[in-house]
Amino acid sequence: MADEEMDGAERMDVSPEPPLAPQRPASWWDQQVDFYTAFLHHLAQLVPEIYFAEMDPDLEKQEESVQMSILTPLEWYLFGEDPDICLEKLKHSGAFQLCGKVFKSGETTYSCRDCAIDPTCVLCMDCFQSSVHKNHRYKMHTSTGGGFCDCGDTEAWKTGPFCVDHEPGRAGTTKESLHCPLNEEVIAQARRIFPSVIKYIVEMTIWEEEKELPPELQIREKNERYYCVLFNDEHHSYDHVIYSLQRALDCELAEAQLHTTAIDKEGRRAVKAGVYATCQEAKEDIKSHSENVSQHPLHVEVLHSVVMAHQKFALRLGSWMNKIMSYSSDFRQIFCQACLVEEPGSENPCLISRLMLWDAKLYKGARKILHELIFSSFFMEMEYKKLFAMEFVKYYKQLQKEYISDDHERSISITALSVQMLTVPTLARHLIEEQNVISVITETLLEVLPEYLDRNNKFNFQGYSQDKLGRVYAVICDLKYILISKPVIWTERLRAQFLEGFRSFLKILTCMQGMEEIRRQVGQHIEVDPDWEAAIAIQMQLKNILLMFQEWCACDEDLLLVAYKECHKAVMRCSTNFMSSTKTVVQLCGHSLETKSYKVSEDLVSIHLPLSRTLAGLHVRLSRLGAISRLHEFVPFDGFQVEVLVEYPLRCLVLVAQVVAEMWRRNGLSLISQVFYYQDVKCREEMYDKDIIMLQIGASIMDPNKFLLLVLQRYELTDAFNKTISTKDQDLIKQYNTLIEEMLQVLIYIVGERYVPGVGNVTREEVIMREITHLLCIEPMPHSAIARNLPENENNETGLENVINKVATFKKPGVSGHGVYELKDESLKDFNMYFYHYSKTQHSKAEHMQKKRRKQENKDEALPPPPPPEFCPAFSKVVNLLSCDVMMYILRTIFERAVDMESNLWTEGMLQMAFHILALGLLEEKQQLQKAPEEEVAFDFYHKASRLGSSAMNAQNIQMLLEKLKGIPQLESQKDMITWILQMFDTVKRLREKSCLVVATTSGLECVKSEEITHDKEKAERKRKAEAARLHRQKIMAQMSALQKNFIETHKLMYDNTSEVTGKEDSIMEEESTSAVSEASRIALGPKRGPAVTEKEVLTCILCQEEQEVKLENNAMVLSACVQKSTALTQHRGKPVDHLGETLDPLFMDPDLAHGTYTGSCGHVMHAVCWQKYFEAVQLSSQQRIHVDLFDLESGEYLCPLCKSLCNTVIPIIPLQPQKINSENAEALAQLLTLARWIQTVLARISGYNIKHAKGEAPAVPVLFNQGMGDSTFEFHSILSFGVQSSVKYSNSIKEMVILFATTIYRIGLKVPPDELDPRVPMMTWSTCAFTIQAIENLLGDEGKPLFGALQNRQHNGLKALMQFAVAQRTTCPQVLIHKHLARLLSVILPNLQSENTPGLLSVDLFHVLVGAVLAFPSLYWDDTVDLQPSPLSSSYNHLYLFHLITMAHMLQILLTTDTDLSSGPPLAEGEEDSEEARCASAFFVEVSQHTDGLAGCGAPGWYLWLSLRNGITPYLRCAALLFHYLLGVAPPEELFANSAEGEFSALCSYLSLPTNLFLLFQEYWDTIRPLLQRWCGDPALLKSLKQKSAVVRYPRKRNSLIELPEDYSCLLNQASHFRCPRSADDERKHPVLCLFCGAILCSQNICCQEIVNGEEVGACVFHALHCGAGVCIFLKIRECRVVLVEGKARGCAYPAPYLDEYGETDPGLKRGNPLHLSRERYRKLHLVWQQHCIIEEIARSQETNQMLFGFNWQLL
């Protein structure tokens, strides 16, 4: 039959080319009897051809061929007509109720704390956004991959199971259309096709043969093409695999990386093709090379090309099945049926089970497809989900064992699907009842851990494998899942099966009971710390499971009693050693106890007692249910053996006490760590707390005296309480004292800790409230810190939110820090100093805080215990411990020793505890007396405490001893507490003595009242004393104040004449800017320039602490500084740099300020010599350091010695040279030196230089005016006639520092090697001056601060030093070079100056031109023979005319670029419309329009032009004011210290010698300026710019800010979920990162998006930062809610994100998962970090505080 079919198959034309019509194969298949065989023959012909090129496949062509040749024909065969039409019909037939989206790693999931049945119930982004849960208390988390959206699952949600999209009755769907049944023909076809397709997928996926295929798939002409296939494993790192491939295949790095990335993503990859021998050789080479770098060789196989082809297609067919099943429930059901059918006559299980069992052997890519198949079929149909779960449980043990042996992540293992089944309540019940799943899981645990069992059948995890044990936790997790929701209805079968599972679980606990026993090390310290982490980790994993088992048991009284019996039996079986050992007798004060001879300090002891603790938990639940009375029916009294039950927990507590007493210090850190976790919040519920409960159980059942004797014996303190003890050994005394303190503390806990439902009459809410109260008594805490200190239940809930507002109030956070909760005053009364969850540190802190608070409130410092709640009936006898003989003996002994001056067997802490016990006893008796008549109260603490200790003559009772203690000076701090106790004795005495006729409660109230009266009297007395002290202090202060005033009046003259020079450096602006300078002289430019008030400047070096006056002739002093590239002001973010550093001409700055060079300083001063020594020392120490360098020493980086800011240079501090102008000369010169004359003089000078340096060439002398003037006017030396003086001389030290700083600016600004002779060095100096001023002005404007009134100290000092450095820097350069630069700068405003590459007026930033021209201008006075500079008067005119010319040019710039759309411009103010300024603006603009051929337009009204001009020019004027102030030292007007926009403009104009109506400038200089205006407007470059309006920069430039972020963080996550990597089409986890500068989303930390920069690989973020922020950038990691600051290629740091939860806290990594909202204040702070150029500083500071040996590789971010 097979042969005949083969012939038939061959007769059909199945060429590899796509068939003309997909119906052909479909109709041919229809004629075959056996579809499976025919289908396989079809695939045998086509698949090897389609998937032939495995090494370098054309994926698009492959997909097209598969679709046309195989999948479309299959769809035709399935539907019998055009599949596109059928699928479209099915698509619109109605919404399916289950979402079923499978999460990929990194996707955000949402859970609702209000509605989810458990935390594993999650929603995908889309369902969440359209669900009711959006407005609930939701949580956000990042999926590890493999989960499943539970939208539509009614068992997952208490309310709101459907989102809008999956709602059954939503608009557009009817009940009928929700399930649109397929017609019978399609169903019949599906039943025929699906089994064959599934069988093929399964067979090919689990195919083991490397060289052969099943007979049906074999073809006659077999090729000899093989592949060497490398598989992924978790033993080898990326680099290991790349190294092995490079060596074995002799390939390039890029090819090896490509292979490695594919292997990591898909799980396998063909790395070599060829004949079998070649591939085999490659396989051996790869294995041997991989063994060189790791113990495990890489997994490599040689596969035939046809096998590879079919395996690849099988997965493609799986994806197709996923698609088809998404259209119809019928398809899913048919698929599930086919998967579950077992082949008749075969031993193999059903197909889905075969896939499950093969899962661990499959590679990653295959697993993903197959898991998706399961998700889209079985998990979408509840009935089949149940059947799948049964198959899963059937093979559970085998699957888990294989997973534990596997090395792949849990998320891609079939075992990870357990959460989808075991957490469904009905399914969990079914699996417990039908398959005893609890027993299956617990037995699996025992079967996978046998290697860790010792000869006593106890676990011992010494030398454990962390990876393997981590995988075992998955099994423990499944136990948690199955128990996560308690049954509401108990059937007999469920009860029986649960008990069976519980017994099985007890076997695990039996192996843990007493595991890893230790013995105290004596004499010699332990050599190697034993492993302890594994045992504690398993304890943590089991914590909630233990609680859940107890809760399940407590659901049913009979079940609880049976479970108690089973647990009791298990404890007794583990305690056989104890019962059979030798006994000893303990005697004290007439009582004796026979107990086992055992010492914790000598014998073996274990901290692990889960059986005993489980029994304690069950006992509490019995008490809570009131079922203790029935306990004897299940556990007879004689068999209860309470001494045995108490023994092991007591040993544990004794061990803790002895560790505190340092008796176990030779046992190393291992034991200390175990003790820490024993009491830590992560473990204490099922360790420490349960041990206390077990002792309370013992105390409630045993005779109190015997119980205390047992405690004394185990604490090894019976000798310490014998009267005869006498020792001089101080260490032993200290040890005894510590042990007594620890024992007393445990006794306090046994008697006083009743806040456990079932132990005391309390609710769960009261327990949590008490925990919170005691945490907040330590200090106010943020929400997360409180939550961290509270135990979580199985749903990760603490119950905190439900009660926190009852006990505390929330205090909102500021710009930094977080919000905190503060305890309400009314909750302070519940403070218990000996709260059993306090650590030693917390106890001390809480006690200190509460005493301090009481002192501030003028209250006594006594901290008695609050009245405890009543014990439950089962525990009511515990209070008898307080009044028993042994307790009285212990207390009396402690007090007697304290009174005895010679005794040292007591401490103050011990006394405090004894007082606390006394207080508890008296409170207990008081409460009982208040509730019942005296004769009914059996508790008799008062009389026992009042009784004499013995019949001796000097015998004393406790009250008498307290009176004596009150008088001991050393116990002054305890005096208030003693007083409180003595008063309480009186209160109880009065209650006892009241007549029986009076109702007890009444007498109790009277007692309380009298007690309150006493307290009130004391309080009033204390208040009176405090008031008297306050008045006394006030009187003294008044006297001192009077004396002070008198002294000042007497020495008034001295105060008036003293100038405050000393505080100069601390002030923000110089003091001369106020009253010392008249308002008229506050002008910086022109002949009316005010004086520069300079004072002697004496600075202190932060390194040597020596003072030095700043003088030109002295050695240099320097400011630490940082020069950096900046894009903070750019108007064109991400603008590419046209030229590299070598070719860039920095003389002219583009008006968009795309890239600037910023110089900032922290303001700290050093001697230049001291700094050089410091820098050399830093270099030396850096060479000796082993950890990563924090800064780049080659680039001159260092940390400021004082503030640790990152610096890379120093600015020399040069004093300002005072320049005084003679007013008479000024007036004379004003008549002579007009603007026209000044321009001619300047042009003549420049022309003269050109003639001088042109070497014989005839230069063109620029002519500005038509009329000729005499030659004498143009004389070369005429500029000198207006006033000169000799140049300033600087010391060599200052010159050196000037050259050093200038070279640094050049090197960093242009990113070139240092070259102090480069002609661009002065250009970069001017550029950084201009840009720094612009950046500071922009920052002040952005913050709405005044120009001079809000400068930070470091900004002020930095600008002052920078400007004076720039003046000096010119003198270190050849003046000929400066001339050339000046000529080029002036050519912008004087177009007739012939110069190369002069930019158009709209293509240059004129403030940069102004700074360069002002600083370079003195070079015109230089001559070969004599070194001159302009006189103050000459300078004043030079500055004035330069500034006026450039200002007029800038006005033209602004008006030409003004947006004529009035709606977007400034609003019209009252009176502006017909103002003089408006008329001038209109007239001037008409003139400009004529010169620009009408391109400028003239549609805008005058008032609009004037307002646009004023707004546009203000930043320029502000920058100019800063420039001239720091250049000349002239005090600015008062208005510039205040915050007034109107006053500011007129003050700026006044200071800069401008008319407030700026158009008057043009009128004043009209004859001179008109030809210039014509040339400016007629410039072809300008006219071209005007035609392209959109490309023009408008003024004022927009202030940059960080991008707008959404208020709700989930919107950002939604945005990230749609992010697709631009270079990768796969669904692998990506790390979307948002650039906060420009809003680009990048693919971070992925090889796919790495770039090569200067031969080095850099990540997408670093590459983006180089273009977007000149190497500096701020990113937000969206899926982690982390802000990252990046600088350069190798530096970065984390920074608090601006998103906060409702408690004012950030949530990096979304660990807590609370809803997050944008904090505008935090975001503003981040914006300021950027605009203040502090990003580099933040990074350096962060790296300095978080130094690591191996840091994060920022380069690949």
UniProtKB/Swiss-Prot annotation:
Pathway assigned in UniProt: Protein modification; protein ubiquitination
Effect the entry attributes to changing D233A: Group 3 mutant; abolished ability to degrade proteins with type-2 N-degrons without preventing degradation of proteins with type-1 N-degrons
Free-text note regarding domains: The RING-H2 zinc finger is an atypical RING finger with a His ligand in place of the fourth Cys of the classical motif. The UBR-type zinc finger forms a pocket that mediates recognition of type 1 N-degrons. It exhibits preference for arginine in the first position. It binds N-degrons with a methylated arginine in the first position.
Induction, per UniProt: In models of cancer cachexia, induced in muscle during the progression of wasting.
Gene3D superfamilies per record: 2.10.110.30, 3.30.1390.10
Binding site for Zn(2+) 2: C99, C112, C115, C124, C127, H133, H136, C149
ZnF RING-type span: 1101-1204
Gene Ontology terms describing biological process: cellular response to L-leucine; negative regulation of TOR signaling; protein ubiquitination; ubiquitin-dependent protein catabolic process; ubiquitin-dependent protein catabolic process via the N-end rule pathway
Amino acids binding a peptide: F148, D150, D153
N-acetylalanine modification, residue list: A2
Deletion consequences: Mice are viable and fertile, but show a decreased mass of skeletal muscle and adipose tissue. They have exocrine pancreatic insufficiency with impaired stimulus-secretion coupling and increased susceptibility to pancreatic injury. UBR1 and UBR2 double knockout embryos die at mid-gestation, with defects in neurogenesis and cardiovascular development. These defects included reduced proliferation as well as precocious migration and differentiation of neural progenitor cells.
Effect of C99A: Group 1 mutant; abolished ability to degrade proteins with type-1 N-degrons without preventing degradation of proteins with type-2 N-degrons
Record protein name field: E3 ubiquitin-protein ligase UBR1
Tissues and organs where the protein is expressed, per its UniProt entry: Present in skeletal muscle and liver (at protein level). Broadly expressed, with highest levels in skeletal muscle and heart. Expressed in acinar cells of the pancreas. In testes, expressed primarily in spermatogonia.
Positions with a binding annotation for Zn(2+) 4: C1101, C1104, H1167, C1170
PROSITE patterns (alphabetical): ZF_UBR
Principal location listed in the UniProt entry: cytoplasm
UniProt GO MF annotations: L-leucine binding; ubiquitin protein ligase activity; ubiquitin-protein transferase activity; zinc ion binding
Residues holding Zn(2+) 5: C1162, H1164, C1200, C1203
EC category: transferase
Organism: Mus musculus
Highest classification ranks of the organism: Eukaryota, Metazoa, Chordata, Craniata, Vertebrata
GO cellular component: cytosol; proteasome complex; ubiquitin ligase complex
Family the entry assigns: Belongs to the E3 ubiquitin-protein ligase UBR1-like family.
